[in-house]
Amino acid sequence: VYESLLCSWDCMAKVGGRPVFERGQILQAISHSPHRPEAYNAMCLWLEFCGHRIPSSEEKYLTMYSYACIGISNILSNKDFEYYNRYDGYFAFLYYKAIAGWYIGKTQESKELFLELANNPNNNLNERYKILIKETIENMGISHLVKE
């Protein structure tokens, strides 16, 4: 059931135009298996791409920060799926915690997390995330702290 809900969300996200349904699928997945991290990652993605539907940006980023923290606390409960392949793992949670933290006033923590993402050789995020991390670090003015 859990994997089916995540696949349903992923399919609708690719089609587009049904963000309320998408969010509902993710919330059902969370309620089905709240100890698993994958649906929290899906919710962070949903907030990134559909979060403009939330009444205030503060609420959007507080929610994203919360889901990223919950995902991190459940990180060891992830399992491989047969079909669902959109789970980005630990470093994606750090990214969402960092970006959301910036917007809710946790600027020092945000900077530290972005530097950890940039400097950690185990960071296996895809190119989209790596570009966003690099651009954000440049915008924060902390590029000089990135190890080469």
Kindly label every feature range from the protein language model.
Residues 1-3, 37-38, 91, 125:
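Helix-start (N-cap) detector for alpha-helical repeat units in TPR-like alpha-solenoids
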Residues 5-7, 42-45, 49, 93-99, ...:
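"A position-specific structural signal for the A-helix of alpha-solenoid helical repeats
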Residues 15-16, 50, 58, 104:
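Structural motif corresponding to the intra-repeat A-B loop/turn of tetratricopeptide repeats
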Residues 18, 35, 82-89, 129-132:
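Structural signature of alpha-solenoid helical repeat junctions
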Residues 27-31, 66, 70-73, 119:
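Conserved structural position within tetratricopeptide repeats
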Residues 34-35, 76, 122-124:
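Short coil turns that delineate tetratricopeptide repeat
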